[in-house]
């Protein structure tokens, strides 16, 4: 049934053809079940394990690796002799890497898919219905409830479907619907129609929503919608329809993979074509096909050399280390790539309640009457410190602490706060914090009584558990609460009837009243001045109301409560307590005592964090279900808006936003910093508009209502105290619910991206070097300088360790003073590409040079000529060109060992170069990252391992080197540091300014 909130109760009953007293007939139930289906959210069609595994191989880099592994595998089949074992090492290792990566990926995805299932926990198990086949109420499974059913709900029940209230069987009906609307206090419901067809959920005061909880009272209603038709069902549909986009990093790596694959394909084809003339060389036994296969193997080796196999693993490790660092700062990251996305966040959309504020209502101002002189009324105004439920804070007058017990008016005010109250404080020993038991507003009054301590109770030696209600207990021992007149919408107040605890006390019975100021003050005939009561006159009333108006608007926007006493209430037996319409009569002839102003105060550290965001070029938008006045006031308090800034086109309610034409809605999202009275759909819409401007949006939320927007935003941030649905739809959970933690996480994200750039570039310049090396040997016709298994070892192990250690580079000092980087910024700019080509060219030439040096000049080398070396394929016993040369020398392990040692040593020098993109090693010495120094030591140790520990030299086709060779290795390798220093100097002085 659409728009049930706008119809009368009679229209709703007529729509389903049902009577409130008897309910649906079995025949109607059957028809409705066929028409509307069961009252449950359908199970999500998750991806099968096989689909998830296949998805992990959609990455281009991974596919190229897979192809290389398959080809290597096929070629290994045709190997003969002792090479067979080593030939299988390469495809086997590549496959192992791919499998490990896929496992990590599948595990991440599986976690993400649990989001929609978590909604199930808000589906109630049972419901109480009236049906024609039974005289009394019956309990049935919630899934069997159908539209048109007459349902009964009472305090503590979970609402089983979206229900239009027909009758309220108690004084009031309060519902906690914070999971759905984000309202911080429970909502009072009624039965009258709400004529606005476009009312937001917060304004549908005659509806109960599926999954919300009844906080007080009892009611009967008719089911309007079930299952997917309910508000919580609509949220599920939104979540199911939201596809996760790739993170900026994933997009970058995909682009990079594409470029790499094109370059690799070109080089492989080029190497193969260059050598067509050598296919018939004697070394291949004169067989053209064997020659073709030989050069095909070299092309595959090239592909292996060009792909940074270690890159996926190093990125995963770096992100995982980043998540650990963030967890220490209370930010728990659920999906690894989002760690880096945080670094380019340009807009943070934050919930107000609990994130920017403490979600702990507290009284911050109060006043009592000081004296009345004719028409002149003077007030005593006090402010109260402390912004949580902890009973710690001071009462200040003119910014100086005062003892509340000195003021008779404050003693009475504290008495009313303590007695006209059903809530209390509780010290949670596991969390180590004070928590509310009951209503937020009432708990604020309980906390105020503890801070005031009007009877100077000795509290210093009490334990935290005893301290929670110490001062309230003293007041409750003096007066005994007889009964409560519950809050009702018509009089907007509640009261308690109290008698003195000691029978011969000087005071008689009293009624203490608290409620909305305008309602209570209208029923006050007197005001309390000290211990006397003075008649309430027009000017006095005006003065009181003007202060309340001032507190309720402007910067403070406090929620004010008036407190009053009826000094001589009627006798108890004269009062009719089961008729709430009479309560107004009993709460008349009141004496006004004072007013308290409370708010959900901003967290202390938020203001500094907002300033940090401003410096870092990040816009903060507050989004809340609260009303606009409160929202703007909090924005001014925390620095989103200036004190006197005109916010005409920078703050909107959900309704105002909807009324704008589409083009203006887009513009509003570009400018605005505050949205109030919003619904879940608004949040998703705002994210969509921001994304259309290429903004990277972080969205916070804690309720079920926030889940679609959390899923849609690039970074969904859930609160630690939030619902399971919000947590599972998000990328990050704030353990302490604190906005400042987001800012710390953004800083960490930026540092991670910078470090990631460094190690990606480090690995790539290494691969460029390997490619140049293989290309040169093939183009010049030299013997192989490096074989695939050696390249794999370098790419995975020797390069992998320093690359991972580069993830520990300290963040730049000005990291939060720069604007967010644009997601479109390339990983490697033109100048950097030139730099890697230059360094890579040197690496390749040095590696080939080291191998050639052994053939041409080494003491223990064969001293062949350059011509013999470049035509070694033609070498045979009978060739006059190779007289006195043993052809087997061209397959000796020494030149390969020289080449590999130079490659590894240069890579270690390169790792030092990568400490900073443009800073000289003189300014940023190696020991700023001690992990890097350690990893270089470890990499060199592993290199010595494959040189000097049997049987490794045989597997890797290497030979032990002596000091003479090592000195040559250093001479060839160290110049790379000088070369990079020159390039950094150019970048610093000619390109950065």
UniProtKB/Swiss-Prot annotation:
Modified residues (Phosphothreonine): 441, 568
Residues annotated as signal peptide: none
Region span, Interaction with PLN: 787-807, 931-942
Membrane topology, as annotated: Multi-pass membrane protein
Positions of transmembrane segments: 49-69, 90-110, 254-273, 296-313, 757-776, 787-807, 828-850, 897-916, 930-948, 964-984
Ranges of the Lumenal topological domain: 70-89, 274-295, 777-786, 851-896, 949-963
Residue positions binding ATP: 353, 442, 489, 514, 559, 624-626, 677, 683, 705
Activity regulation field: Inhibited by sarcolipin (SLN) and myoregulin (MRLN). Has also been shown to be reversibly inhibited by phospholamban (PLN) at low calcium concentrations in vitro. Dephosphorylated PLN decreases the apparent affinity of the ATPase for calcium and this inhibition is regulated by the phosphorylation of PLN in vitro. Enhanced by DWORF; DWORF increases activity by displacing sarcolipin (SLN), phospholamban (PLN) and myoregulin (MRLN).
Location in or out of the cell: Endoplasmic reticulum membrane; Sarcoplasmic reticulum membrane
NCBIfam families for this protein: ATPase-IIA1_Ca, ATPase_P-type
Protein name: Sarcoplasmic/endoplasmic reticulum calcium ATPase 1
């Amino acid at each position: 049934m659409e728009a049930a909130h706008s119809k009368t109760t009679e229209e709703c009953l007529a729509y389903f053809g049902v009577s409130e007293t008897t309910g649906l007939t079995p025949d109607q139930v059957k028809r409705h079940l066929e028409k509307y289906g069961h009252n449950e959210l359908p199970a999500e069609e998750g991806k099968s394990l096989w689909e998830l595994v296949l998805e992990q191989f959609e990455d281009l880099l991974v596919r190229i690796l897979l192809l290389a592994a398959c080809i290597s595998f096929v070629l290994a089949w045709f190997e003969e002799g002792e090479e067979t074992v080593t030939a299988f090492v390469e495809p086997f290792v590549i496959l192992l890497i791919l499998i490990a990566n896929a496992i990590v990926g599948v595990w991440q995805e599986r976690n993400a898919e649990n989001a929609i299932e978590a909604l199930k926990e808000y589906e109630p198990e049972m419901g109480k219905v009236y049906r024609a086949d039974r005289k009394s109420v019956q309990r049935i499974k919630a899934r069997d409830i159908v539209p048109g059913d007459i349902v009964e709900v009472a305090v503590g029940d979970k609402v089983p479907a979206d229900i239009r209230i027909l009758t309220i069987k108690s004084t009031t009906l309060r519902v906690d619907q914070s999971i759905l609307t984000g309202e911080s206090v429970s909502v009072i419901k009624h039965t009258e129609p709400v004529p606005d067809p476009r009312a937001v959920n917060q304004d549908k005061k005659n509806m109960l929503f599926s999954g919300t909880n009844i906080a007080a009272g009892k009611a009967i209603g008719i089911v309007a919608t079930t299952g997917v038709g309910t508000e919580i069902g609509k949220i599920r549909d939104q979540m199911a329809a939201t596809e996760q986009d790739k993170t900026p990093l994933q997009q970058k790596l995909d682009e990079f993979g594409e470029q790499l694959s094109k370059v690799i394909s070109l080089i492989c084809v080029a190497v193969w074509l260059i050598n067509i003339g050598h296919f018939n060389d004697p070394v291949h036994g004169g067989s053209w096909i064997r020659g073709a296969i030989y050069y095909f193997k070299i092309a595959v080796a090239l592909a292996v050399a060009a792909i940074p196999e270690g890159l996926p693993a190093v990125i995963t490790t770096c992100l995982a280390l980043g998540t650990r660092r963030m967890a220490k700062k209370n930010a728990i990251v659920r999906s690894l790539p989002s760690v880096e996305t945080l670094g380019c966040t340009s807009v943070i959309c934050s919930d107000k309640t609990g994130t920017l504020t403490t979600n702990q209502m507290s009284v911050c101002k109060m006043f009592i009457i000081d004296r009345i002189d004719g028409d002149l009324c003077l007030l005593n105004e006090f402010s109260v410190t402390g912004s949580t439920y902890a009973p710690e804070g001071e009462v200040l007058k003119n910014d100086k602490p005062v003892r509340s017990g000195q003021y008779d008016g404050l003693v009475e005010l504290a008495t009313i706060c303590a007695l006209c109250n059903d809530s209390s404080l509780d010290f949670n020993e596991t969390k180590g914090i004070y928590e509310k038991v009951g209503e937020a507003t009432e708990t604020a009054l309980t906390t105020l009584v503890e801070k005031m301590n009007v009877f100077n109770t000795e509290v210093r030696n009490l334990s935290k558990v005893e301290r929670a209600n110490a001062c309230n207990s003293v007041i409750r021992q003096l007066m005994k609460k007889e009964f409560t007149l519950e809050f009702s919408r018509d009089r907007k107040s509640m009261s308690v009837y109290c008698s003195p605890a000691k029978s011969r006390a000087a005071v008689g019975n009293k009624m203490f009243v608290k409620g909305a100021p305008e309602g209570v003050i209208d029923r006050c005939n007197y005001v309390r001045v000290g211990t006397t009561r003075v008649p309430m006159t027009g000017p006095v009333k005006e003065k009181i109301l003007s202060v309340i108006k001032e507190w309720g608007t402007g910067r403070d926007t406090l929620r004010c409560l008036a407190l009053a006493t009826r000094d001589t209430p009627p006798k108890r037996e004269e009062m009719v307590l089961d008729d709430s319409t009479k309560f107004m009569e009993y709460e008349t002839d009141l004496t006004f005592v004072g007013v308290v102003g409370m708010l959900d105060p901003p967290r202390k550290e938020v203001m500094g964090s907002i300033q940090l965001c401003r410096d870092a070029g990040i816009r903060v938008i507050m989004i809340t279900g609260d009303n606009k006045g409160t929202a703007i006031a909090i924005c001014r308090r925390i620095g989103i808006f200036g004190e006197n800034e005109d916010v005409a086109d920078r703050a909107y309610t959900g309704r105002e936003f909807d009324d704008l034409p589409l083009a203006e809605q887009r513009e509003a999202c570009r400018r605005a910093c505050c949205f109030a009275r919003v619904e879940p759909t608004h949040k998703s819409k705002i994210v969509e508009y921001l994304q259309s401007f290429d903004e990277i949006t972080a969205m916070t939320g804690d309720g079920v209502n926030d889940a679609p927007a959390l899923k849609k935003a690039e970074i969904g941030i859930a609160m630690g105290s939030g619902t399971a649905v919000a947590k599972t739809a998000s990328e990050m959970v704030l353990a302490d619910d604190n906005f400042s933690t987001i800012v710390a996480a953004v800083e960490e994200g930026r540092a991670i991206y910078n470090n990631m750039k460094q190690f990606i570039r480090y690995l790539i310049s290494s691969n460029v070097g390997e490619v140049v090396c293989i290309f040169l040997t093939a183009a010049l016709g030299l013997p192989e300088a490096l074989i695939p298994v050696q390249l794999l070892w370098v790419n995975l192990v020797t390069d992998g360790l320093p690359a991972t250690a580069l993830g520990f580079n300290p963040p730049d000092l000005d990291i939060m003073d720069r604007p967010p980087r644009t997601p479109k910024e390339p990983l490697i700019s033109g100048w950097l590409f030139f730099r890697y080509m230059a360094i890579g060219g040197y690496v390749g030439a040095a590696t080939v040079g080291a191998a050639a040096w052994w053939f041409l000049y080494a003491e223990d080398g064969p001293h062949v000529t350059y011509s013999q070396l470049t035509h070694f394929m033609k070498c045979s016993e009978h060739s006059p060109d190779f007289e006195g040369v043993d052809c087997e020398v061209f397959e000796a392990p020494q030149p390969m060992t020289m080449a590999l040692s130079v490659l590894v040593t240069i890579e270690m020098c390169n790792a030092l170069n990568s400490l900073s993109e443009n800073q000289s090693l003189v300014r940023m010495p190696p020991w700023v990252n001690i992990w890097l120094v350690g990893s270089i030591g470890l990499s060199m140790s592993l290199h010595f391992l494959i040189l000097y520990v049997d049987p490794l030299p045989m597997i890797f086709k290497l030979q032990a080197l002596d000091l003479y060779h090592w000195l040559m290795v250093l001479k060839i390798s160290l110049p790379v540091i000088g070369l990079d220093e020159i390039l950094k100097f150019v970048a610093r002085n000619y390109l950065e300014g």
